[in-house]
Amino acid sequence: MRTSLIILASLTLLTGAIFALWPQLDLSGSALFHGTDGFAFDQPHLKALRAGLYYLPVAVIGAFAAAWLGALMGLPLPTALRPRGRSLVFLALGLALGPGLLVNVILKDNWHRPRPVQVTEFGGPLEFRPWHRTDGACVKNCSFVSGETSGAFWLVAPASLAPPPLRLPAVALALGVGLTTGVLRVAFGGHFPSDVLFAGLFTLILVAVLRMILIKPDKQGLRGDDPYL
């Protein structure tokens, strides 16, 4: 896990350096989805997909909470479907501190970065700002970073609690959901590429730190014989 943290921190620093030195990469990435009629991928079927992905983290933690309450009430649930309290704390803290506090409370309302649909390069009234500039004209719910992408990458947390034979495929699936959500946010003109990359990296770092603190080594996930969860 410490190796994962080092890798994630290094990727975050590298991402920051690349998009600070070449901020036009954000404009070029968003321009791939922009045409004469605006952001062409803003279509009903893709909006429906976005809505499903948006509510997926809430559905997942709701399912964990329901299973935990069911086990607490003595319902005859299979061992693999009986999460322990420490697992639920891990998931709840990850969702509250990552997509909740860090992204939506601290960053989005205080970084002042205009969204792609708001900047002059794509027909909006505001001036583009690189990710490291906090003097943009956006006032609230701004572009840096992507809340939906952060929530989607949080799904790595419950995926990491899967039984060992299923853990790697579950984590890979969660990462795929995160990447898909990030691409959709760029395609809709809601965020620049750096917004979604930072959202994913920040969330993965937080999940890794919480997992190190709350989940004991070699006693992870939904294992029924785990006395520590």
Where are these regions (language model features)?
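Aromatic-anchored segments of alpha-helical transmembrane domains
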Residues: 15-20, 96-101, 176-186
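Interfacial segments of alpha-helical transmembrane regions
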Residues: 70-110, 171
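Transmembrane alpha-helix boundary/anchor motif
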Residues: 20-25, 101-106, 188, 204-209
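Structural signal for the C-terminal ends of transmembrane alpha-helices
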Residues: 21-22, 66-80, 159-166, 209-215
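N-terminal transmembrane-helix/juxtamembrane module of multi-pass inner/ER membrane proteins
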Residues: 1-68, 108-115, 120, 127
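Membrane-embedded catalytic cores of phosphoryl/pyrophosphoryl-handling enzymes
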Residues: 2-12, 128-229
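Juxtamembrane loop-transmembrane helix junctions in multi-pass integral membrane proteins
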Residues: 41-55, 79-83, 162-169
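Alpha-helical transmembrane segments of integral membrane proteins
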Residues: 53-61, 89, 194, 198
